[in-house]
Amino acid sequence: MSIFTPTNQIRLTNVAVVRARRAGKRFEIACYRNKVMGWRSGAEKDIDEVLQTHTVFVNVSKGQVAKKEDLVRAFGTDDQTEICKVILSKGELQVSDKERQTQLEQMFRDIATIVADKCVNPETKRPYTVILIERAMKDIHYSVKPNKSTKQQALEVIRQLKETMQIERAHMRLRFILPVKEGKKLKEKLKPLIKVIENEDFHDQLEIVCLIDPGCFREIDELIRSETKGKGTLEVLSLKDVEEGDEKLE
């Protein structure tokens, strides 16, 4: 699709239209065809790489620009860039059935790849292959949600797969070095957030090497910072605790 806008007659090519309805009105934005899904998945963060123009239209193909009063009524603002972001995130991408199916298949593969990268079999500590995760997702009839990021959906998939197979997030290995004064008290607060304590050394300071669920990292980091007034240290030894070697579970 190619269009001319009536204001500046700039020719727009490779256009993907995202449409939303608000307050009884239709609003559209012109995007680069291959960038919309990247924005929604979080892979693309530069809005200028996604939008062909920071203009909200009533009809992109005819170049009809939305009226300011309609924008304010529907979105509560006339900031076109912010409105574009809302439409980009929540609107419906206008594509052919074939294009939509291709995009959904790509998102399905991307979700499976994230799950395979982040998870292991808890008994063997071996990672799963992407092919096996794809097969498991099909077995639970997982349906891709085009308006949600692949990372969010990967977390959903992990939760659902736990009901049918041995799978869990690979643990992170951390080292804490804590001042003696706060060490014992802080250790008790950290215990519920720790999966396994692998090593503990208590001399001039308390040093702990442990495994945690990645979802607890931020809470642990904030707890150590606040309780030690910045005197404690937290070191990530490995992002994924997996068995060494090339073997993967098929």
Swiss-Prot record:
Chief place where the protein resides: cytoplasm
N-acetylserine modification, residue list: S2
The keyword Transmembrane helix is assigned to this record: no
SUPFAM superfamilies: FYSH domain, Hypothetical protein AF0491, middle domain
Localization in the cell: Cytoplasm; Nucleus, Nucleolus; Nucleus, Nucleoplasm; Cytoplasm, Cytoskeleton, Spindle
GO molecular function: microtubule binding; ribosome binding; rRNA binding
Keywords: Acetylation, Cytoplasm, Cytoskeleton, Nucleus, Ribosome biogenesis
GO biological process: bone marrow development; bone mineralization; cytosolic ribosome assembly; hematopoietic progenitor cell differentiation; leukocyte chemotaxis; mitotic spindle organization; rRNA processing
Gene3D superfamilies: 3.30.70.240, Ribosome maturation protein SBDS, N-terminal domain, SBDS protein C-terminal domain, subdomain 1
Pfam families: SBDS_C, SBDS_domain_II, SBDS_N
One cellular-component annotation, GO: cytosol
Entry-linked PANTHER family: RIBOSOME MATURATION PROTEIN SBDS
Subunit details: Associates with the 60S ribosomal subunit.
Chain's role: Required for the assembly of mature ribosomes and ribosome biogenesis. Together with EFL1, triggers the GTP-dependent release of EIF6 from 60S pre-ribosomes in the cytoplasm, thereby activating ribosomes for translation competence by allowing 80S ribosome assembly and facilitating EIF6 recycling to the nucleus, where it is required for 60S rRNA processing and nuclear export. Required for normal levels of protein synthesis. May play a role in cellular stress resistance. May play a role in cellular response to DNA damage. May play a role in cell proliferation.
NCBIfam families assigned to the protein according to its UniProt record, in alphabetical order: RNA_SBDS
Family membership: Belongs to the SDO1/SBDS family.
Protein name according to UniProt: Ribosome maturation protein SBDS
